[in-house]
Every structure is written in C-alpha cells, then in structure tokens.
Amino acid sequence: MFVYNLNLYKNETLMKKKYNYQILVVILTLFLGLTKRVYAQQSVSFNSPVNTKTRPVELQLKKTYELEKAGVSASNEFDGARLSDFILENDSTATVIIKPENSPINNSGYYAFKTWSSSPKPFYFTFHYPKGYKHRYIPKLKINNNWTAIDPTFIYRKDSIVTIKLNLSKDPILVAAQEIQSSTDVKNWYTNVVAGKEYVTVKSAGNSVLGKNIPVLDIYKGDKKNKKIIVLLTRQHPPETTGYYAFQSFLETILDDSELSDVFLKTYRIIAFPIANPDGVDLGHWRHNYGGIDLNRDWSVYNQPEIKQIVKFITTASEDDEGDIILGLDFHSTTKDVFYTNKKRDNTSMPNFIDYWFAGLERNIPGYKVNESSGNSQEPVSKGWFLYGHNAVGITYEIGDATPKEDIVIRGQVSAKEMMKILVYIIKP
C-alpha cells in the first residue's frame, strides 16, 4: 500500500511539472509576442526633439454671418471651412477674420467660406490675420461645382493686406485658400479608384482624436510574405491639397493595371495613407490635428493617436509579413516644388535610388528640373523616421501651392512610373 501511494505521488509530481512547463511556454510565447508589439512602436531618436503633447485648440463658431445692411452673407457651416468672424466695414466691404487653431503655428493662413447676397452686386472682402501672420494662398472659387483661381485683376494688395472683389448673387460662391478635399471627398476618391481591384484591400489604421477613420490602402499581388514595402502618406497638414493631388496621380498610376504595374505589385507591397489628419482637414485647420500638434513633428514618441496608429500599422505589417520597409514618400505642399531628402544614403536600403529617380524625372518631363533640398532630419519628421528607424529612403515630396494641376498630374504619373521601373529593373529585391 505504501509503495502504491509513493508511485502515485511520483506520477502526480511529474504531471504537475509537465503542466507548469506548459504554462511557462504559454507565458513566454505571450511575452515574446508582447515584446514584439512593443518593439514595433519603439521611439526613434532625433537630434532636436519636439514636444508633441496635446495642446488646446480654438474651435471656430459654426454659423452663417448676416450683414443685413449690405445684404451679404457668409457661412462656415461645412467640412473644411475656416472663418472666424465676418465684419461689415462699409456698404461695399467686409473684413474676413481668419484665426489659426492655436499658436505658434506655421504661416499657412487657410480660409474657406461660402458667400452670397440678396441681390447681384460687386462686393469686397479684406482678409485679416493675427499679428505675425500674413496672406499666403491665392483664392480659389467654386462656382457651379467647378473650381477656378480668382481673376488676378480682382486681387488688391496694400502692403501685406489683401482684398478681393467678388460679383455676388443669390447663388453661393465658395471661397477657399485651396480646393477643399474633405475626409468624405477623400473616401469617395479612393473608393472609386480601388473599385474592382481585388489586389487592393481598404483597411483602417485606427481613429483620430475625434474618432474619424484613418484609412489605409494595402496593395500587392500574390503572397505578401517577404515583399519589400513602400509607404505613401499625405494630408498630415490639412491645407496641402496640391501635395494630395500628386499623391492621387502617383497612386492611380500604380493602380493603372499596366504591364509595369503588374510586375511591380507582384514583387513589392504598397501601404498608402490618403488622409493622415482627418480631424484637421474637416475642421479647416491651418496645420495641426485636433490635439493641437503638427503631426509631422510626432515621428519620435508618437504622442498623437494618428501617428501612433500609422506607425503601428506600418511596423506590424513589416514584422508580421517579414517585409523590409525600403522607401517612404510623404506628400506635402509648400511655396514651391521641392524634394526634401536625407543626405545619409550609404548603407541604407537603396543608396542610389534618389539619383536614379531624379534623373528619370528630368528625362521624362519636358523642361523639368528637380529642386532638391538635402539634409538629415533634425526634428522628428517622417523622412527621418524612415531613415533612422528603418534604414530606408525617406523623401518629403512637396508641390508648390500654385503649381498648375495639369503639371501635378504629369509629375505624379512620371514619378510613379520611374519608381516602379527602378525597383523592378535596376534595384531588384
């Protein structure tokens, strides 16, 4: 009897050890998986850190302003609007007050409002900005659903003060710093572009501060395992629609089902973010998100949910599918066409890509000369994140505020084709 109990005890002890071992294996597996996920969002160091903790923003009062004495109205009651106040100066002129969401802030004095009158008349609008800021954008007009730049003879400048003349009627005219491309407009565009293309999956990186979707287009043919990754970004800064148009043209070219595109997408994977800052876009912000931060300074510690979730999506895709991130293109707008590049290229994913790419642009766009500004990123911007975080090529692709749309389309098309040619035929995976 005693021997039987001893054997039973030994068996129970062995079973407990085996059970404890299995638990240990499960714990280690979970820990390693968690470690991997934490690693995916590790911060990237920059020489000049920027405080990107949330700051308050000033929301504009959404309303229709009625100047009864003049019979003129103006409204900011639509997505992408920016009108802080509307004040009658005399029977033919009103002051348009434009304030940013907070400050300090880049001089990107964005405005957008609808205006109309009770009877046909010419009327003048004088723009007023806070001290230290001045008028940047040539007004664009949306009349009968068509956008056009204002007639230059209807713009009057006195020192830094800008006044415009509009011929008003009961039919509203939409006046904006740049053509409006709200989050709804962006969704309508990419939904139409990817329709019928089974190799494109529309996903979500997460939600903005206000709960708006941050869409992602995941693009590849065949198995995504081990495919090298190219990341495309735009609309970190709300008013920068000319950069967004280049992004559109670039992506549409990749999705044009050409022979080149087919070979490219069987070899590489595109992860594209068509609107990184949906809150800022729809609120008519000059530059920041609803957290009051320039998102293109948050690529180090990811204090803002938009960048945190974009980074998580990119790095998780790279790790889960064992695909190296080799190139990041971030589409923006500024006062002129320019490519901001990193000086460091040796020992990166593609040391010669930029030289090949720029040569291809100049060779295939008549009369075009690349404007490059090269410098390793000191502040936490996306192009620096690609370099310092992934040893990848990072480029900020800037289009001028007033670059004609037909030129933007051509540059987007050619730059996409040249990228695909280089990656398929010259720099092979």
Per-region residue spans from a language model:
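Active-site-adjacent mobile loop/cap segments within catalytic or ligand-binding domains
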Residues: 180, 296, 337-348, 373-429
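Short, hydrophobic/aromatic beta-strand segments
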Residues: 123-126, 174, 187, 244
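Bacterial Sec-dependent N-terminal signal peptides
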Residues: 1-45
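Short secondary-structure junctions
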Residues: 149-153, 198-204, 366-376
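Extended acidic/polar, glycine-enriched regions
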Residues: 156-198
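Extreme N-terminal flexible tails
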Residues: 41-169
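Active-site/substrate-binding loop(s) of hydrolase catalytic cores
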Residues: 199-215, 219-220, 224-363, 367, ...
